[in-house]
From Swiss-Prot:
<comment type="pathway">
    <text>Pyrimidine metabolism; UMP biosynthesis via de novo pathway; orotate from (S)-dihydroorotate (quinone route): step 1/1.</text>
</comment>
<feature type="binding site">
    <location>
        <begin position="108"/>
        <end position="112"/>
    </location>
    <ligand>
        <name>substrate</name>
    </ligand>
</feature>
<feature type="binding site">
    <location>
        <begin position="315"/>
        <end position="316"/>
    </location>
    <ligand>
        <name>FMN</name>
    </ligand>
</feature>
<feature type="binding site">
    <location>
        <begin position="59"/>
        <end position="63"/>
    </location>
    <ligand>
        <name>FMN</name>
    </ligand>
</feature>
<dbReference type="GO" id="GO:0006207">
    <property type="term" value="P:'de novo' pyrimidine nucleobase biosynthetic process"/>
</dbReference>
<dbReference type="InterPro" id="IPR005719">
    <property type="entry name" value="Dihydroorotate_DH_2"/>
</dbReference>
<feature type="binding site">
    <location>
        <position position="63"/>
    </location>
    <ligand>
        <name>substrate</name>
    </ligand>
</feature>
<dbReference type="GO" id="GO:0106430">
    <property type="term" value="F:dihydroorotate dehydrogenase (quinone) activity"/>
</dbReference>
<dbReference type="InterPro" id="IPR012135">
    <property type="entry name" value="Dihydroorotate_DH_1_2"/>
</dbReference>
<dbReference type="InterPro" id="IPR013785">
    <property type="entry name" value="Aldolase_TIM"/>
</dbReference>
<comment type="subunit">
    <text>Monomer.</text>
</comment>
<feature type="binding site">
    <location>
        <position position="294"/>
    </location>
    <ligand>
        <name>FMN</name>
    </ligand>
</feature>
<keyword id="KW-0472">Membrane</keyword>
<feature type="binding site">
    <location>
        <position position="174"/>
    </location>
    <ligand>
        <name>substrate</name>
    </ligand>
</feature>
<keyword id="KW-0560">Oxidoreductase</keyword>
<dbReference type="GO" id="GO:0044205">
    <property type="term" value="P:'de novo' UMP biosynthetic process"/>
</dbReference>
<feature type="binding site">
    <location>
        <begin position="243"/>
        <end position="244"/>
    </location>
    <ligand>
        <name>substrate</name>
    </ligand>
</feature>
Length: 338
């Protein structure tokens, strides 16, 4: 109800200013109001973690972990922050975030703008939140793609003690050549190095933190099969499907559709859900799938689970529907078979 009142004001601002205003409000709420708790549902065990409900926040809304306690008040079963890089970087020039309200879509070309992993670590340590926290890691824009693994490993070392799980983002379309890491040989090398580091860190900290891989929706069937094989071979703990799409098939003629960047929201739902279904077949239940992409209502949340996902993440849907979407989706997925 409150969001219905606030939305016209937020939509009167340019998209990134509205994003910044929302983060500031969540930050204030987190610092001044009692700690939040997840919307009630039967817990589900995924990656060895007990998630209080199946609905989580996708990475991208809170890149630096500034508003974790405020976000915790919205009822999520888990929160994913980032994408974070080893060094601070400004991202791409503004404007770089565009709403497509006619189709409930968003285009972004943010470019991993963030304050660097050390700032995120400090913010996580300062937060009161004790729930399931994912931390999404990436590479700096000026790190050569052949050295990308070094950036992921640097971030993993620093966030490992604080994360419930760590997501390796190789699928943003807004960092030059990043999606090359989804190639067969590149992915094999990256996952091998990450798995070795995970095992070393587990011994060092006496605690196993799962690794997930976030992939794109713009993949051929053979690529999905290759990725599934690599995930199994390197014993990665889960996969997130999917990131944003570079396709504009669903938004032809819509204002801002020509803007460069990744498209999210309702227009990516079908492609993203198809990847979930293909992954589910290719993986044969050997590791869980976390679905993201176009979850705008309870029907689309359940469709992700029916396609083979174990957990569901929201982001664009929050912008168009507000916090009520979290509660609705938790309730709609609470009775889904475990």
């Amino acid at each position: 109800m409150l969001y219905d009142i606030a939305r016209p004001f937020l939509f009167s601002l340019d998209a990134e200013t509205a994003h910044e205003f929302t983060l500031a409000a969540l930050n204030l709420a987190g610092r001044t109001l009692p700690a939040g708790k997840p919307e009630a549902a039967d817990a589900v065990r995924v990656m060895g973690i007990d998630f209080p409900n199946r609905i989580g926040l996708a990475a991208g809304l809170d890149k630096n972990g500034e508003a974790i306690d405020g976000l915790a008040r919205l009822g999520f079963g888990f929160i994913e922050i980032g994408t974070i890089t080893p060094r601070p970087q400004p991202g791409n020039p503004r404007p770089r975030l565009f709403r497509l309200p006619e189709v409930r879509g968003i285009i972004n070309r943010m470019g991993f703008n963030n304050h660097g992993v050390d700032t995120l670590v400090a913010n996580v340590k300062a937060a009161r939140f004790k729930g399931v926290l994912g931390i999404n890691i990436g590479k700096n824009f000026d790190t050569p793609i052949e050295n990308a693994a070094d950036d992921y490993l640097a971030c993993l070392d620093k966030v490992y003690p604080l994360a419930s799980y760590v997501t390796v983002n190789i699928s943003s379309p807004n960092t030059k050549n990043l999606r090359q890491l989804q190639g067969e040989s590149e992915l094999d090398d990256l996952l091998g190095r990450l798995k070795s580091a995970q095992q070393r860190l587990a011994d060092q900290h006496g605690r196993y933190v799962p690794l997930t891989l976030k992939i794109a929706p713009d993949l051929e069937a053979a690529q999905i099969t290759n990725i599934a094989d690599a995930l199994r071979r390197h014993r990665i703990d889960a996969v997130i499907a999917t990131n944003t799409t570079i396709s504009r098939d669903k938004v032809q003629g819509v204002r801002f559709a020509e803007q460069q960047g990744g498209l999210s929201g309702a227009p990516v739902f079908e492609a993203s859900t198809a990847v979930v279904a293909q992954l589910a077949t290719a993986l044969g239940g050997e590791l869980p799938i976390i679905a993201a992409g176009g979850v705008m209502d309870t029907r689309s949340a359940r469709a992700k689970l029916e396609a083979g996902a174990s957990l569901v993440q929201l982001y664009s849907g929050l912008i168009y529907r507000g916090p009520c979407l979290v509660r609705e989706c938790v309730r709609a997925t609470a009775d889904f078979p475990r």
